[in-house]
Each structure stands twice: as structure tokens, then as C-alpha cells.
Amino acid sequence: KQKFILTGKKSYLNCAYMSPMLKKVEKAGISGLKTKRSPHKLMPTDFFNGVSNLKKQFASLINLKDYERVALAPSVSYGMANVTNNIKLESSENVVLLGDQFPSNVYPWMSLVKKHNAELVFVEKPKIEKKCGELWNKKVLEKINKKTKVVSMGMVHWADGTIFDLEKIRKKTKEVGALLIVDGTQSVGAMPFDINKIKPDALVCAAYKWLMGPYGSAFCYYGEAFDNGSPIEESWINR
């Protein structure tokens, strides 16, 4: 608790919504703002060292050897837009999502499917109480077929905490030649996530929950499927 500024006898447990700010994160943010006071003191390496350090830490967290496959983004929707910008669909193909999935991982796919006149498949939560998560996992696997181009989902559902077996889902996507895109916002930082076991084609995580970062920041991992791709915007520093 001493790492946070939480007054009184409060116990904060709702990081699934938003984590409290760590003292050292707040300090780093203030320090970053202060550097603009004296731009003449900035060195060329200052544009890259801090970012590289963050990328290395995130890579270590997900057991990724090549930290250069990590990119920083302002949001999950931005990271997902970079994914959808580099996927072409046939009208006969589909994209599989979870029912009531968070909009950041829905709207980009809606636009992509509309653009290519393809199909968007939502796997809805079963209307049962016992073994609901088990059945939901089974339904996801059943919806993945030879027409599936992409499965995009979280390891943990944001609305009710259902856990999905991404290793089994990854195996099924490989069998049909589909991509697996993961929104790790609800799990990475709170639960183990091994990139070498799950092997997603892309992983996007907002930092303001279990990663204990500030709002308006996200980490993205892009696998080989997106090598030589096109970002949604071009700048001198984003390649």
C-alpha cells in the first residue's frame, strides 16, 4: 500500500476497472513533463531510451525475447486499428468475436467486415449458470471453421470475468489457418501470459488496469503475420 497514495484505511480492489496510480509512475510522469522546461538539455537518445525500457519490461512480462516487436500506442482501439489495417477479407470469410465484447475490440472489426462485405460472428454467452464458462469456451471452438479469417478476443471477459483457454483456441485457429488477436487488458499483469505458449498473431493491452500505467497508453505485440505491414499513420518515429 505504501507504493500508492491511498488515504485512510481504504482497500482498493477494482483494478479490473482502473488501477490507482503508483507513486513511481506519477513521479515519472511529472519528470517527463518537466523535461519540456529545458529543451536545450534534451539529447537524441532521450527520444528512445525511455520507450525502449518500457518495451523491454513488457516483453519480459509476456516472455517475449524480441522486445522490438513491442509497440506503444494510445489505446486498444488504436492498436486494433493497426491490425485491421493490415488484414484483407474475402466476402466468404468471417471474423469471430465474443458476445458483449468491449467496443475497442469490436468497432475496428465491424468496419473491416463492412468494407469487405464479410461476416461478423458473435459467440454469445450461454444462458446457464453451471459450467457457463466451460460451455462458452466450447461454443467459441465450434464457431471457428474454414471460413474464419480472424478470432479476436480477450483471455478474460471484461463484463463477467469468464476465462478463455487461449491455447486451445490458438490450436483451433491454426488448424483452419485463422489469425488469433488478443486484447489482454483484463488479464495481462494480473495473470500469467506466455507469448510462446499462446502464440497470438497480435496482443494489445491498455496500460491503465493491471499494468498499473497511466490512462491513454497501451502496449502492442505484433507477430510475423504483420511484418512489413502499414501503420494507420506515418511519422518519423513510429517505424
Task: Map each language-model feature to its residues.
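Pyridoxal 5′-phosphate
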Residues: 1-239
